[in-house]
Amino acid sequence: MVSTNIENRILDKIITSNFTKRELKVLLLIMRFSFGLNRDFAVFDKKDFFLAGILPYHVDDILKGLVVRGVIKWNPDKQMFGINKNLKEWIDRKQKADQF
């Protein structure tokens, strides 16, 4: 049986953060295709977020919001997505973040 290894400190931070349902689905999808394949980044098209039930017209807003808050790293040119492991850079929704 294969498993996805996620550091407890990352899970703890996700649990204690105020993410929307869509943001959580995006994070889980990125973790599955990065950590689940023993990689730091997942590589897939934005249309693949439909696997998590995210409609295409929501994807950009969700990704930009997570990038602005420092939760994910995103290279739009290469379609690479990764969880920012430096949890000190994460900004809670309650804190003010500069817009993308």
Identify the function of each model-found stretch.
Residues 18, 25, 97-100:
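Surface-exposed, interaction-prone regions with an acidic/low-complexity signature
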Residues 1-14:
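Long, low-complexity, charged/polar intrinsically disordered regions in eukaryotic proteins
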Residues 87-100:
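Short, amphipathic alpha-helical interaction segments positioned at domain boundaries
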Residues 13-17, 22, 33-89:
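Winged helix-turn-helix DNA-binding recognition segment
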Residues 7, 23-27:
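Short, leucine-enriched amphipathic alpha-helices that occur as contiguous helical runs
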Residues 1-3, 72, 94-95:
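Replication-associated primase and helicase/ATPase modules
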